[in-house]
Swiss-Prot record:
UniProt entry tagged with the keyword Secreted: no
Molecular function via GO: GTPase activator activity
The protein's name in its UniProt record: GTPase-activating protein GYP7
PROSITE patterns: TBC_RABGAP (PS50086)
InterPro entries cross-referenced by the UniProt entry: Rab-GAP-TBC_dom (IPR000195), Rab-GAP_TBC_sf (IPR035969)
SUPFAM superfamilies xref list: Ypt/Rab-GAP domain of gyp1p
Annotated gene: GYP7
Amino acid sequence: MSIELLFCKSQVYIHPTKNLQDNVSGYLLITHQSNSETITSSTISWIPENSLNEEDINFLNNAETRNINEKILRLPVSSRKLNTLLGSGSFLSSNWQFTIPVLSLYSVQFKLPNTWWYGSCILYSKSPRETESIPVLYFHDDLCPSTISKQKELNRSFDPFNNSNEMYWGGQDFKDALGSIVELKRVESEPTFWLVNATLEDLRNFSSANLKSSEEKPSSSKDDGVTKLKEDAWQKWESTKWSLMSQFADITAKTGSFVGSLIKKHPVVQLVERNKNNYYVQKMLKNPKVVEIQDDFDSAKIYLAKWALSVKEEAERYQEGSYDNPYRRILVSEFGLTGNEDVSFTEEELNRAMERNHPMTKQKWNSLFDSEGRLTVTVNEVKDYIFHGGLADDATRKEVWPFLLGVYPWDSSEDERKQLRKALHDEYMELKQKWVDREVNLDNDEEEYWKDQLFRIEKDVKRNDRNIDIYKYNTSDNLPFPEDTAPTTDDDDSIKNPNLKKLADILTTYNIFNPNLGYVQGMTDLLSPLYYIIRDEETTFWCFTNFMERMERNFLRDQSGIRDQMLALTDLCQLMLPRLSAHLQKCDSSDLFFCFRMLLVWFKREFNYDDIFNIWEVFFTDFYSSQYQLFFMLAILQKNSSPIVNNLQTFDQVIKYFNDLNSKMNWRDLMVRSELLFIQFHKTADLLARRQEQLIPENSGHDTSDIEGGTEPKTQSYISEHLQTLLSKEVIIQKENTRTKDSIK
C-alpha cells in the first residue's frame, strides 16, 4: 500500500505545563493512501522533534520546504520510512506523540493567534475518551520556516490575509490540507469550530443553535455595542422598507389602479412614467379617466402582475438572509402554521425545507465510502443530503449523477464499478457500430425514416445550447471562425464541434437502442446538460438511457404519458390552489397548457444551466415522489397565484405572463415552496383517506348486494387516481408501442 505525505509543518508545540522550558517542539503531518479518494487510511500525526534522528529531521524539513510552494504535498513515503517516523504507531505514547485516523475526527477548533498567545488547534474525536488524550497543538509561527516564508511573500504582495479574509497563520496551512481530503463545515454560532464530514442531522442541529445564538449573543464592549446599535438600526430600516414594499406590491396587485397605467405610449402614460413620484401626478392617477385608459390596455394588466411579483421577489431576496428572517414569516403567512393541524406543517418541517445551505462536496461524497468503495450510509441519507442541499460543483456531479441515474448500483464496490464501466463501454461501442457500418435498407420506407431521424438529430443538435461554452462554435477546435471565413448560419454547415458531434452520436446510438421511440424533438434538451457534466460519451449515453426510462412517457406518440401528468397537475391545482384553479377556468386556461413545455423537458428552457443542474439532481433523488416535478410546477403556480388572480383575465394574458417568466424565477425559493406543498398534499391525502375509512363502516349495512354476489363493495376514493400516484417513489415507466409503417413519425 503506497502512502503519500500530504502536509508537513515544523515548530508545532505542545505545552504540557505553564513553564516555557517544558514546551515540546514537533512536526504535524497528514498522510493519505496514494490514488485513493477514500479517507479510511488517512491519519494526522504529531511527532516530537527530540524523538527523531538527523536523517528523519532532514527528510521532514525538506518536505516542509516543498510544502511552501505546493499547497498540498503528494510526497510518496515508503511504509518503512513511515514506520520509522511514527515509531510504535500507537495512538498516544509517553512522549506525547500521537496518530489519529482522520475518519475518527468529529470537529477541529482553530484559535487564531493574538498579541499574548500563539494560534492553536484542538482535535475532537468521535470518542470523548480519545479526545481527552489528544494534546492542544500550538503553532509557533515566529519559529516555523514555512510560515515565515509564506508571511514574507504575503507581505511583499501587500496582502497579509488568507482566502477567508483572516490574518494568515500556520494553522491555516493545516486547515487547507485537511480540507483537501475531508469536508470542513464552519459552525457559525461558534466560528472557531469546524465540523469534519458532518452528517446532515449535525448541520441542521448546529444551524438551529446558530439562530438562537445570533439572537442572544451579547456585545463584548462599549464600542461593539455602539456598532451593533447602528447595525440594528440599519437592519430595522431595511427590514421595514422591504416589508412595506412587499405589502405595497400586494395592495397594488389587488387594486390594479396604479402601475398598470405606466405603460404603452399614451401621452398621459409617458408623463406618469417620468413623474410617477410627483404628488400631483399621483393625484391625477386617481382620476376616473386615467383609470379608464389603463383598462383599455390588456398588457397593462400583465405589466402590473409582473411588477407586483418582482417587488415581492426583491423583498424576499433581501429577507432570506436578514437578521430575523422575514422570509420565514412570508412562508408562514402564505402556507400557514396555524389552522387545521392535520394539514399544516410543523416548525421542524418548515426549518428542514428552508435549510438548503449545505451542498454535498467532493470531500463529503468520498467520505461516505469505505476502503473497498462501498457506501457506508443508507441510500436515503445520501438522497436526503442531495435533496436538501444539492451538489457543490460539477466535479461532484460527475461522480454522483451516474448513481442517481442508476448507472452504478448503490451497493457496488469500486472494483465492481470498474468492471461495469468496461462492460458498458463495450456495449455502447457495439451499439454505435451498428449504425456506423449500416448498409442501405432495401425497404424504401424504412430508409426514408432513418434519413429523417438523422436529419432531425443534426438539426436539433446544431441549434442546441449555443450560448454554452462547449457548444458555442461549430468548429473542430470549438474556437471562433476567423472573421473573413465565418459562415452566415449553421444551417448549411455540417457538425464540426467535437462536443456537438458526440451529442449527435449518442442520440443516433439511442435510436438503435430504442428503435420504437427513435428520436423526438426535446431529447437534445435532456441530453445536453448530462453531457456537459459527464464529458464522457459512453457514460453519458448510459446516463441518458436511464434518464429516458422515466422520460419516455413524455414523448409517446399518443401523448398519453404527458397527458397523465397534465391531468395530475390539474387535479393537484384544484386541490391545493382552488382559488387559482377557479380563476384559470375563467381565463380558459384550466387545462394548464402553459405548463406543457416546462414539464416536457423538465424546465430546461425556463432556467439557466446552473439552475437546471440543481433542479434536476433534486428530481433524480425521488426523495418524496418520483413525480416531484409536478410539485415544482405547483410551486410556480402558487408563487404567481396572486398576481394572476388579481390582474389577468384572458388566455393570451396567462400565456404571455408565463412565457415572460423565463430565466426570472428563483429556483431555491421554488424548491422550498414545493417541499411545503408536498407536505401539505401528503397530509391532506392522509386526512381524506382517514375520513373515507370512517365512512365505510357507516355505509356498509345499507347495500349488501355486492357482498352477497361474491364481490367487494365499491367505494369512491376522495383523491383521484392521478393524485394517488404522486405519493409513490417508484418511477413510472411507459414504453412506446412497437413502431410500424403506419406509426406516426
